From Swiss-Prot:
This is ATP synthase protein 8. It comes from the Eukaryota. Keywords: ATP synthesis, CF(0), Hydrogen ion transport, Ion transport, Membrane, Mitochondrion, Transmembrane, Transmembrane helix, Transport. One of its GO terms (molecular function) is proton-transporting ATP synthase activity, rotational mechanism. GO terms for cellular component: mitochondrial membrane; proton-transporting ATP synthase complex. The gene is ATP8. F-type ATPases have 2 components, CF(1) - the catalytic core - and CF(0) - the membrane proton channel. Mitochondrial membrane ATP synthase (F(1)F(0) ATP synthase or Complex V) produces ATP from ADP in the presence of a proton gradient across the membrane which is generated by electron transport complexes of the respiratory chain. F-type ATPases consist of two structural domains, F(1) - containing the extramembraneous catalytic core and F(0) - containing the membrane proton channel, linked together by a central stalk and a peripheral stalk. During catalysis, ATP synthesis in the catalytic domain of F(1) is coupled via a rotary mechanism of the central stalk subunits to proton translocation. It holds the Pfam family Fun_ATP-synt_8. The chain crosses the membrane at residues 13-32. It is found in: Mitochondrion membrane. InterPro entries: ATP_synth_su8_fun.
Length: 50
């Protein structure tokens, strides 16, 4: 019965927050700046050509 094991839910919540924090860190550090640089280069090229 899950009611008898309160540490199971604490464990799930802890690991969920850790995985979410790692995912947000990886997204903000590595993946999102590539999209920002791509968007900036596209707008710069379109301003040069237009």
């Amino acid at each position: 019965m899950p009611q008898l094991v309160p540490f199971y839910f604490v464990n799930e919540i802890t690991f969920t927050f850790i995985i979410l924090a790692i995912t947000v860190y990886i997204l903000s550090k590595y993946i999102l700046p590539r999209f920002v640089r791509l968007f900036l280069s596209r707008t710069f090229i379109s301003k040069l050509l237009g």
